[in-house]
């Protein structure tokens, strides 16, 4: 299984058409499945996650002795350094469908799967598997609860889990 970008999320980064060509080359090498994602963490971190970074929480969790200067910068200009990307469920689906049309190999959809209905939509669009992130961080029993037809994650995409992850 290989994880690859559908686009990088900034002007000079790879765009969809280029990433489709990369994926087609990967497919030629007999990879079992491809996980489709997007974003370049150091330049466009919230392309891959959506929502806003909780700047105060991020600064709070940073080591005050090692990163004092970064904590100070975050508190004053963090909102400019890490712009908010509005969250919507299945946020990569439209782009991922372009890859589905261009590739024959199994594809793993990732991006805003917050309930059973989202997973079923991705599977109905031709994706072979779904990958779930935030919803599992919020509730480790999420997959079992998805057996209920209308179950939806309680995750509000506050991204406090991301702030903590970046500071460990």
Predicted regions, residues:
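Flavin-dependent oxidoreductase catalytic cores
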Residues: 1-168
């Amino acid at each position: 299984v290989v994880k690859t970008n559908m686009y990088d999320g900034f002007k000079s980064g790879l765009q969809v058409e280029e990433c489709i060509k990369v994926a087609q080359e990967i497919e030629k090498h007999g990879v079992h499945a491809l996980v489709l994602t997007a974003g370049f963490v150091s330049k466009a971190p919230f392309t891959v996650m959506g929502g806003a970074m909780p700047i105060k929480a991020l600064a709070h969790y940073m080591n005050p002795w090692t990163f004092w200067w970064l904590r100070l910068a975050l508190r004053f200009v963090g909102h400019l350094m890490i712009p908010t990307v509005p969250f919507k469920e299945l946020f990569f689906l439209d782009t991922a469908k372009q890859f589905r049309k261009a590739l024959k190999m199994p594809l793993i959809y990732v991006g805003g799967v917050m309930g059973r209905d989202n997973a079923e939509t991705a599977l109905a669009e031709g994706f072979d598997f779904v990958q779930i992130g935030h919803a599992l961080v919020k509730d480790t029993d999420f997959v079992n609860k998805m057996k209920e037809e209308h179950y939806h994650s309680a995750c509000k995409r506050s991204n406090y889990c991301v702030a903590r992850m970046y500071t460990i």
